[in-house]
């Protein structure tokens, strides 16, 4: 039987996404003790997968390659910044800039495996043409209940 869940997809903040996902020492220092939302006992259970077609690139390099490809194919620079424009009625609306790399936060159960999420990624690719570049399972993120860590 299928289980209902949700995913929130938004433009990827390339400058901080990989540091957060890989739990770099600099990232861990910068989040500070007061803002800590990680359960240290569960860090060892984190898992990740990098799409072999993605190669050895980091996200910034991949983004720069996309920018070059857009310039080569269209002759124009990729429109990265949000801008405002007026409609025919004079109303001002915001037009989002290009965000070719997006990230999604998927709610999972504690027993969800990396293979389960990879199958979900394959389904997204078949249905909507979204290709997962990286998958990170953060089993160390959570909240505190009664003084004891509880994973989300």
Q: How should each PLM-predicted stretch be described?
A:
Residues 1-152:
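N-terminal nicking endonuclease/strand-transfer module with a His-rich metal-binding environment
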């Amino acid at each position: 039987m299928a289980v209902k869940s949700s995913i929130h997809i938004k433009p990827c903040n390339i400058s901080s996404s990989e540091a957060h996902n890989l739990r770099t020492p600099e990232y861990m220092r910068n989040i500070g003790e007061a803002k800590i939302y990680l359960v240290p006992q569960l860090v060892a259970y984190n898992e990740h997968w990098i799409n072999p077609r993605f190669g050895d690139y980091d996200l910034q390099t991949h983004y720069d390659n996309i920018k070059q490809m857009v310039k080569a194919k269209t002759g124009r620079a990729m429109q990265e910044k949000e801008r405002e424009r007026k409609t025919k009625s004079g109303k001002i609306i915001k037009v989002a800039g290009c965000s070719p790399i997006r990230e999604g936060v998927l709610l999972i159960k504690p027993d969800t495996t990396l293979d389960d999420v990879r199958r979900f990624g394959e389904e997204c690719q078949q249905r909507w043409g979204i290709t997962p570049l990286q998958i990170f399972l953060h089993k160390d993120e959570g909240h505190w209940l009664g003084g004891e860590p509880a994973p989300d």
